[in-house]
Each structure stands twice: as C-alpha cells, then as structure tokens.
Amino acid sequence: MLLGVNIDHIAVLRQARMVNDPDLLEAAFIAAKYGDQITLHVREDRRHAQDFDLENIINFCKSPINLECALNDEILNLALKLKPHRVTLVPEKREELTTEGGLCLNHVKLKQSIEKLQNVNIEVSLFINPSLEDIEKSQILKAEFIELHTGHYANLHNALFSNISHTAFALKELDQDKKTLQTQFEKELQNLKLCAKKGTKLGLKVAAGHGLNYKNVKPIVKIKEICELNIGQSIVARSVFTGLQNAILEMKELIKR
C-alpha cells in the first residue's frame, strides 16, 4: 500500500508566524524520500500552502505530487501550468477547519475541469463520500482515481477508542452509548469495503484519506482494493515528538501488507 504524505500542516505551523520556517520544501524532500507521494492542498484563501510552495515542490522534488484543490479557476489554471502528477478535486468552504465532506459530483464545471486536466496528462482523482452512487458517477465522469472520505469512520473510531468524549473536542452527534457507536463503526467500515470493491470493479483506482492515524489505520489497510492512503495531520503531529522521518517510517510500517 502506498503512502501519500500530506504536508499541509507543516505550512500551518509556518503561517502561524508568517515567516519562512519551517521550510515546506525541506519537509517535501523528507516526505519524498520516505513516503511514496507528496500531497498538498492549495486552498482558495491560501491559508496554508501558497502557490510558490507548489511550484517549488514540483520543480525540485522527484516524488509524484498530488495537488488537492477545489473547482477554482485560478488554482486549476495553476495546475494546468505546473502539471502535478495528479489533481484531487475536493470540496471547499471558507469557514471550515478541514475538508468536511465529499465532492458534489453534479457540479456543472466538474466534467469540463476533469477533461482539461486530463488533456495535459494530469491524472484526476475525485475526493468523494463513500457511497455507491458517487462511485458510479465518478466512473461516468471518467476520473482515473477516487479517494474515499474516511472522516466518519475516523470520528467513530475516536469516539469508541479514545477519551475524546470527555474533552471539548467531542462531537455532539456521537454522544451515544458504546453499543450504538460500535454498530455504527462496523457499518461504516463495511461500507468502505463495499465502496472500494465497487470502485475497483468499475476500473477506478481507489485511495482513502481524512482523519486516518496510527490508531485507526489498520482496518483500512486490510481493505485490499484500497491501494493508497493520504495522511497528513497525524503524521505531522507525531513528528513534533519523533521527527518527520521517523513519523513517516512508522506509518509506512503500519500500512505494510
């Protein structure tokens, strides 16, 4: 299984002080050496990664670059100019802390944007909710890749197997008894398995990501149809204590098949 290392949260740390440290390019070199792919989300408001980050990483890193971006003309034109290995189209809201759900596949610009990217040999992935309907739509749209949103799975795992319910970060919708949470967790995991199988059957390459960490990744690794995981925040958080190289290698060991 391949690991895409999302380095957005290195940029978060840099932007917190609006200085040039930590150096995102240095992080990209480490991610390229020990991971399989660099994933970077250039948001419309540029709150984390900047255009020059993407350009530098594409110019100087040998690793495949997976650009996450919304259906935004300015950023799509940047992608067409710089030509990352892949573009993963994601939904985006200005007020969100992180990507909250899968892409709306009925967006009028979506098909046209996919074709433009593919015409310059950029692979296209769609970040989607794990639903059979969205997988079928992705195949109709002729995307090469889908990335299944694992956020709900991750939230359920956290509610079941951590102390988050006793903290300010608890989710109100998951304020339920353990038996109910366990049932929902098993249902969501089974749904991810069915979606991965469906995607593969339709000829799509299947990735997964969002909220995955060192505690919850193992059940996802067992879904053989998923060929790649894109993981960022948990790796960067671990790197504060272990260093980025060790944090990546630790995750690589966990996802080894």
Curated annotation (Swiss-Prot):
Role played: Catalyzes the complicated ring closure reaction between the two acyclic compounds 1-deoxy-D-xylulose-5-phosphate (DXP) and 3-amino-2-oxopropyl phosphate (1-amino-acetone-3-phosphate or AAP) to form pyridoxine 5'-phosphate (PNP) and inorganic phosphate.
Protein's recorded name: Pyridoxine 5'-phosphate synthase
Residues that hold 1-deoxy-D-xylulose 5-phosphate according to the record: 8-9, 43, 48, 98
Catalytic activity annotation: 3-amino-2-oxopropyl phosphate + 1-deoxy-D-xylulose 5-phosphate = pyridoxine 5'-phosphate + phosphate + 2 H2O + H(+)
Active site: 41, 68, 210
Residue sites binding 3-amino-2-oxopropyl phosphate per the record: 6, 17, 211, 232-233
NCBIfam families reported in the protein's UniProt record: pdxJ (TIGR00559), PRK05265.1-3 (NF003625), PRK05265.1-5 (NF003627)
Subunit organization: Homooctamer; tetramer of dimers.
Cellular location(s): Cytoplasm
Keyword tags: Cytoplasm, Pyridoxine biosynthesis, Transferase
GO CC, any one term: cytosol
Species name: Campylobacter jejuni subsp. doylei (strain ATCC BAA-1458 / RM4099 / 269.97)
Keyword NAD annotated: no
One GO term (biological process): pyridoxine biosynthetic process
Entry's EC annotation: 2.6.99.2
Domain of life per record: Bacteria
Pathway: Cofactor biosynthesis; pyridoxine 5'-phosphate biosynthesis; pyridoxine 5'-phosphate from D-erythrose 4-phosphate: step 5/5
Enzyme class, UniProt record, top EC level: transferase
